[in-house]
């Protein structure tokens, strides 16, 4: 599971995923990429399941880049606990993904195989996605 080795603060303020991405908007490393069409918090388990879905469909020659990382911890208070008495304990790690962010990239295999792998990865994610080609205007 992806999570940071160290963080300066254990419990950050919630970061909004509304609006469009400022960076990470084009395919830089691979030939095809998976772009988010809407914003969300993508947790480490969802990133991992998408990574597994891609790597199952890629041959050993294929290369994959994961362009997002879960830097932010989400907290949760235990069940049936009264309000107040501080913030809850960290429960999971999430990546803040805004609309237009390229999340995964693939190279070194045929175009049909790349599209199939990215489609399978998109099914594992809780947001609408689209497959983009390198150099394509977004």
Swiss-Prot record:
UniProt keywords, alphabetically: Ribonucleoprotein, Ribosomal protein, RNA-binding, rRNA-binding, tRNA-binding
GO CC annotation terms, alphabetical: cytosolic large ribosomal subunit
NCBIfam families registered for this protein in UniProt: rplP_bact
SUPFAM superfamilies, per the entry: Ribosomal protein L16p/L10e
Name of the protein in question: Large ribosomal subunit protein uL16
Family: Belongs to the universal ribosomal protein uL16 family.
GN (gene name): rplP
Span of the signal peptide: none
């Amino acid at each position: 599971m992806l999570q940071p080795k160290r963080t300066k603060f254990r419990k950050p303020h919630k970061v909004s995923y509304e609006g469009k991405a400022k960076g990470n908007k084009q395919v830089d490393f691979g030939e095809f990429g998976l772009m988010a069409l809407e914003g969300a918090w993508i947790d480490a388990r969802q990133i991992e399941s998408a990574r597994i879905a891609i790597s199952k469909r890629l041959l050993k020659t294929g290369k994959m880049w994961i362009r997002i990382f879960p830097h932010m911890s989400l907290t949760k208070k235990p069940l049936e606990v009264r309000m107040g008495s501080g913030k809850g304990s960290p429960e999971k790690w999430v990546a803040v993904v805004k609309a237009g962010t390229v999340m995964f990239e693939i190279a070194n295999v045929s175009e049909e195989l790349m599209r199939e792998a990215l489609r399978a990865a998109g099914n594992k994610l809780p947001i609408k996605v689209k497959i983009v080609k390198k150099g394509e205007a977004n």
